Amino acid sequence: EGNPHCHVILRGGKLPNYDVANVKICEKELRGAGIIENIMIDCSHGNSEKNHFKQLNVLDDVANQIAEGNNSIIGVMLESNLNEGNQPIPDDLSEIRPGVSITDACISWESTETALRQFAKSISGATSNRNLKSRNGN
């Protein structure tokens, strides 16, 4: 049977794939395969062209898609940490800056909070009656 609450994550690749055209392609492919059209957008990675600041542009675009009536986008992912940026792992671990990623560059907690509050405000009217779609209708 599988997970009735499954979703696809669009994270980009060589090019971003969070835009309206690519979301529609994903919806069509899922529908054609008989899979529920639940899509999550990764605002980082290929969709931000690995520039952590561009995550906010992706998030704004996704908010617009939802506000304009898209019902298949069920969530977003952001790369976030207490402080922005990233750092290499130093030989002397006491030099690690707390709250700064040691992998991909992240937006700061302050930027994250501001962005998510704006995102919620932007989509509030469009999401008040939405439910997560599942294979079994629950």
Predicted regions and their residues:
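Expand to "…catalyze enediolate/carbanion chemistry for C-C bond making/breaking, isomerization
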Residues: 1-137
